[in-house]
Swiss-Prot record:
Pathway linked to the protein: Secondary metabolite biosynthesis; terpenoid biosynthesis
Organism in which the protein naturally occurs: Origanum vulgare
Family, similarity comment: Belongs to the terpene synthase family.
Protein name according to UniProt: Bicyclo-germacrene synthase
A biological process from GO: diterpenoid biosynthetic process
Enzyme Commission (EC) number: 4.2.3.100, 4.2.3.-, 3.1.7.11, 4.2.3.20
Free-text cofactor note: Binds 3 Mg(2+) or Mn(2+) ions per subunit.
Amino acid sequence: MEIYSPVVPAVKDVKRLDEIRKSAKFHPSIWGDFFLSYNSDNTQISEAEEEEVAKQKEAVRELLAQVPEGSTYKMELIDLIQRLGVNYHFEKEIHDSLNYIHENSQHNDDEVRTTALRFRLLRQQGYRVPCDVFRKFTDGEGNFATALTNDVEGLLELYEASHLATRGEEILDRAMEFSSSHLQALLNQHLVGSVSLSKRVDEALKMPIRKTLTRLGARKFISLYQEDESRNELLLNFAKLDFNMVQKMHQRELSDATRWWKKLEVAKRMPYARDRVVECFFWIVGVYFEPCYATARRILSKAINMASIVDDTYEYATLDELQILTDAIQRWDVNETLEDSPPHVQMCYKALIQAYAEIEDEVVENFGGEELYRVQYAIEHVKQSAVAFFEEAKWIYNNSIPTVEEYMKVAFVTCGYMMLSTTSLVGVGSDRVSKADFDWIVNEPLIVRASCVICRLMDDLVGDEYEEKPSSVLCYMKQYVVSKDEARARLEQQVKDAWKDMNEECIEPRPASMQILTRVLNLGRVIHLLYREGDSYTDPNRSKEWVKMVFVDPI
């Protein structure tokens, strides 16, 4: 997150503060009460729909079973199921098939497309497949053969596979440079081939599979796949039915979230804060969209909305007011009202305490009182965030620019991804997470640190024009005496390296289950989408079409 807000906090001049507060207005919500219209009546899933989905699901399962293990068609089928967003129905079947491929494949294919597809599928599953399988497609100097440029499908698979690289895998770095440059050239010259393939290449160059949000990616791929003349009608129809059924569930959840948000009266009581309940829910569906994570979505949605309010309050309040708020959050006294504090401080604290009380109720109701320890892990992150936000406010108050190391230590906390990574586990079933998982994730493992790097730096790279607030760009420029362009280039490389660290953590032996690691990976995917070409959180018009595709328009 940081859910970066370009408002100047903690200024010394009270008169200037008043002027800033009057002008510190974000774009209002573009959705308003739109999602309140979705209720149990118009989002009801009929018995006939459920029966049809179940019927087609079994037909797809039979298709998977009929295709010979280890065959190219089996890999293509698994890839289609994953990209259509219905792989969560067939996790065991896919695991068994890919395990067979991993144990029995000789990697002796002559086609780059097959080699790259196998490599990507296995790496996505967490298998440590050597990148040397691509050397057969290079010359003595390690350059990829120019003949590969005649195979668009092969180039596309090579490009997608290259995004599964870890640090030190230079051949995959060269594969990415080679494939992306040639695909772009072919696209520019209209030499890709069919319209359907051209659209796939264009989408891949914008958003490779590894960085794609599963739900949004599935919505887009379904539209592309139905234009494919070789499409499998069974798979396509099942994907459409499943997407629409899950969309109805999300619509009900978003209606509930909107109703909860309205009760907070944020627009009235905290008008300086961004009204982004819909965008926050989109963020969380990016972390987990599957029906089994409904409780987790409710909890994480409340947490991210509270993080946004707290962030905006620390951007808005004076330093003295922030001292009061920070101290109160450290005490975390549910009976404290801060009645002698300004209204916005009182409301921020009250909303925060109330939200986490509701989260505790959710945990008790769904998992039992013995699981309440989960919420304490989440609250501890909120406390750490308050201290870090206050540290940032003091930098601005004192007109100081910290070193890159000082900045990143604080910004890792204020970006919100440590908090979201931990809180993403709070609403997950006891069969999927344990106390040991919480102990692991709060100790800042590499994958969480990498997600923080991606979040913090991508946020800064689109928001560095706001020079009132120290950013990694400004800190880097000052410390290393380089131009803004040079600073940005080096920070962009750090983002690329962070993705490689994320990939490494997902390969066996893994530090946690793939289900847990995927939550953190998905957080990285969300930030890549939202901040790739601008701040699509603060400016809701940037994310409007994505929201419509996922929550409004059925297929």
